[in-house]
Amino acid sequence: MVRFLIERPIAVLMTVLAAIVLGIYAYTTLPISLLPNLDIPEITVRINYPGMDARNLENTIIKPLRNQLLQVGGVVNIESSTSDGMSELVLSFSYSVSTKLAFIETNEKIDELMSIFPRGMERPMVIKVKPSDIPVFYLSITPTKDYYDAGKSFKELSDFSTSVIKRRLEQLSDISMVDISGLDHKQIEIIPNNEKLALLNLRYSDIITAIKRNNFNIGNLSFRDGYYTYRLKVLPIITTTSHIKNIKININNNQVSLGEIAEIKTTNHPGDGIFIYNGSRAISMAVYKHMDARIEKIGERIDVIIRDIQSANPNIIIEKERDQTQLLSFSMDNLKSTLAIGLFLAIIIVFLIMKNFRLSLIVSVSVPISLIIAFLGLKIAGISINIISLSGLIFSVGLMIDNSIIIIDNIKQHHGIQSDISTAILMGTNEVIRPLISSMLTTCAVFIPLISLSGLSGALFWDQAITISVSLVVSLLISIMVIPVLYKLLMDHNTSNITHSSHLLIIYERALETVLNHRKVFLLLFFLLIPLGVSLFFLVEKEQFPFIEQNEFNVKINWSEPVTLAENRYRVVAILKSTVSDEDAIYSANIGKSSFQLQKDSRQSINEATIHIELLQKRKKDSLSSGILNYTLTNYPGSKIEILPSKNIFQTIFKPNKESLSLRFRNNTYDVIDHQFIRYIDSLLLDSKLINKANHTSLNELYELEIEPERLLMYGISMDDIITRLKILFGILEVDKLQRSNSSYNISITEEQHNLFNKIQNSTISNIDGRTYPLRNFVRIRKVNRLKSIVCDQSGEFYEVPIDNMKTPDILQSKINNTPMATSGIGVDIVGSILERRVLFNEFLFVLIISLILLYLILAAQFESLLLPIIILLEIVFDITGALLFLYIFNSSLNVMSALGIIVMSGIII
């Protein structure tokens, strides 16, 4: 075959050129993303049932649903968190499970239970988590002072953002969705005059009935006239606030308009949450891309739209934040520059060793050709350009150069002996084909057990394994098919300047002679490396994934008090103004509940806030975070505050925030976790010094109102009337919706706000005869402590406490055994990332052993010897010890990425 190729150089070069063209085309069409497009093995089920308390929701809906979803194939774990009116179940699967099939099966299991759920409950929402669910970036839309001076309101900005900005962005083909939060909503409020209602013997139910009777929409009708059929549209009675005021109510054959007995007004309100940007109220937009979109192009197109909108609307400011395109650009540019520098240095070293420009040129040409054609292989294999596949290409560059040097050096040696260059090329190439194939197999052999790793590690390594394998196959083909042709073309009339690097050979021969003359000493030093390597393994810090430095972070605050939205905003702004200057950082905050559809922040309570801080100076991170922490705990000592990394794709997939060690407590006596159980557990933990301070942020202080049905029956008051009265008294009773062309407004009944006891003390309720009685005669109020949320897994309810002052689970278990928890009917489970890390490193050890066995078998087959492969494999001991030593010296950790590198290099060095 080699003779056939070197005799047809034009055909070979044209074939290579065609492959290069296809490779360039493949590169321009490959998706570019930070990480491989993994199916994250997690499905979230969200349940909304406003008005039902957490305990009833857990018992009647969530518990049966959790038991049903446990039957979904491949479920590894299921956890639920239930609070008043809402719940979220998270199903975790192994990476070998198809999340598409699991998603379908989850929906089927939910459909089977819908018949037993209460009527009127929305169908649970099933969400499949994907890397593309992370917003590419956020847009903050802030009105200037001139905007308000022009007489415009925040509601107008909300309408403009929804109808113009959001739509303009979603028109881009690369954008899949734009989520929005921080809007003002218009609402029509009806505030009845209770004195007039009592005088006219009217009840709230009369007002509700009148509104619903007049606010109808029966759609389009049709009628026939001869041969023609016409559509008939019935116009609604209510289209404006004035129409609501003119609604008539019959009273003893007399009519009274609603506007005469109630104040009707249109208001704008933010709901239960707002968004601020650099201290001013703003609107936040989360921009999501399509799965296959090239992320680096999205930012440029968005910038054009932002400039157009701002030029037409100078009174609003649109700013990008949490820009993932910058993270991608930085990561990709870093890897590409590393690849280019590595290739350049390798070629320089080849030239210094060979001291022949033409031979160096052959290597310089063959490696880029292999890289370009490798992109065609990635396109066929369905692999995107990401940091994992690019790191695989960087690995491959050295191997490509090795293959080229081996072929060239062997041909060169035969060329020095043979006068016929074709014979030299033929003999030199055929001699090394088998060793090159064997070398490729030993390198690829370590990939087979690595792919079998459980969890994220195995899934991530698939891209790297395919990339390196494709690159090695392409490099092998280029080495045995193209390099001989290039050698003949470039070296046919040039043999005089082919020299060897004598200095390196002299140094190598002297070193080898020294080792052979003192073989016992060097053997002793070699065997001493084994205990050194073991010691370094225990000394090197271990973590699941490497630390990723960021110039931004989040601050999550729970005030542990039932503060209002206004008070929540006041506290957040006070903290930020006291600790953050405009020169140090840019900040934004979601205060209370957010209205994002795809984010868990929407589960945030009204007394919580999440602050995002983007640093302008990296060195300020520690001082800034500690300043926020100290100020908050000093001024609001009961609050719970957490400093968390900013959420990006790495945080979503790697989940580094998981506690190292936590204790999960279960009540084996009653199977229910309540506030008394939590306080008892906290007291035991404090006594045993497992925690330094009890944190009761999992408890809510609230009031319970109990209706006395016997008294209602005695005085002729219906349960519906008192429930309606309470809804109006303690909140807003949504009666109906007023539909317009492209929007809808809630029609609600409310009252002037007073404190709890004044409301109960001064309010009245009428019976069916029109007699009025004090509301306090029919209800009882008491103050209680309840769980903020009920947390469960497949074993039932639990209370989880992070343990920060314990290094290993073994020490923690011995501490638990010496406390009353061991014998008091309390179930205790130890969970955390440390345990997961143990499992992972045990798997890595197993993979390393399997890889060594495979390497031994391949080498034994190649050398037809059982002893020689053992001698060769002893080199790995020295290499692993050296790798651990450098990790220790440079204060790095042994993690998934470094462990993968060690195992892959074990195959490469052989």
Predicted regions and their residues:
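Hydrophobic transmembrane alpha-helices and their membrane-interface caps
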Residues: G23-T28, L345-L352, F357-K412, L857-I910
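C-terminal transmembrane helical bundles of large multi-pass transporters
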Residues: Q324, Y636-I910
